[in-house]
Each structure stands twice: as structure tokens, then as C-alpha cells.
Amino acid sequence: MKRPLEMAHDFLAEVVTQDDIVVDATMGNGHDTLFLAKLAKQVYAFDIQEQALEKTQERLNQAGLKNAQLILQGHETLDQFVTEAKAGIFNLGYLPSADKSVITQPQTTIEALEKLCSLLVKGGRIAIMIYYGHEGGDLERDAVLDFVSQLNQQEYTAAIYRTLNQVNNPPFLVMIEKLERYRHG
């Protein structure tokens, strides 16, 4: 059985091509940025911590990839850089090996999700990894689930992939796809 993050990558890899623009809304250590840079024409990656940009740039340099723009800003500013996207990924929580008090916040995450949903091309996808074992994580989890469950079913489909028998608040995946065409009825 695949872990949620593996499923997230597979979910995006099914639709992303070398012609596409994609977003890594939470750069972190750069694993998702690197993954997306191998698939897409251009990656826009966001983080508010300088350490994240440094680690990600190092990872991209080692792979010889130059198709990622690393942006030291919150993901809620993504619409200042991106006009349309085929895919996006969020890893909510905190940057491992960094200050664990610096966490993603419900209001900016929802703002970023709203913007990315509107910028998604038809057939585009968003993968949201929700880590919620830290203080404040449950509030963000609930805000994201509330937002996603209210997306118009004529325009989007959404699903959750999670383990049921794991302890200690295991992370889970929320998947959103913008439908190719509106459904009726």
C-alpha cells in the first residue's frame, strides 16, 4: 500500500507534462519542488523561511535543474507569480529540522487554496498533505477539510487518502481535481 505522500506524487504525475506550469506551495526541504521540476516546464515554489530556499536550491543544483523559481514569500501570494497552473502541492505543518513554531496557518493556506483552485486549468490537480500532530495543526486540518468539502461539485472533485489504523495523528492526503467539463445534474 502506498504512503500518502507517494500517492500525492502519483496523483500529480498522472497529469503533469513538460509543457506545464506547477506550484509547490510549501517548499520545505525541496523534495516536492525537485519532483515537480523533473516533470514540468516551470515550477513556482514558495516558502517563508530562507533555510527552505537554500536547501531546495542545493537539491535542484545537484540534479542540474533550472526550471524552478524559488520565492521567499507566503503561498498566499502565488497569484502574483502564476496566472495558470496544471498542478500544485501543499505539505502543511512545519519544516522538519527547522523552527517548529513556524507553521502553516489556516487563513493563508485557505487563501492560497482559493487562488490555486481558480488558477488551475481544467484537468488540473492539487495534492494537500495534512500533518496535524503539532499545536495548531488540528485547526488547519479542519479549515482545509471544510474548504475542500464546499468546492462546487460541478467544477471539482475531491477525495481523501488516509490510513485508518495508525496512531499519533498520521498525515493524510486531500486530492482535488478541476473537472474537464462541468457536470449537469
Residues of each region from the PLM?
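S-adenosyl-L-methionine
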Residues: 1-21, 54-84
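Helix-to-beta-strand junctions that scaffold the AdoMet/dcAdoMet cofactor pocket
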Residues: 17, 65, 120-122
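Conserved SAM-binding loop of SAM-dependent methyltransferases across substrates and taxa
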Residues: 29-40
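Conserved SAM-binding motif I beta-strand of class I
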Residues: 42-47
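Mobile active-site "lid"/loop adjacent to the S-adenosyl-L-methionine
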Residues: 93-111
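Conserved beta-strand signature within the Rossmann-like core of class I S-adenosyl-L-methionine
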Residues: 119, 123-130
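Class I S-adenosyl-L-methionine
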Residues: 137-185
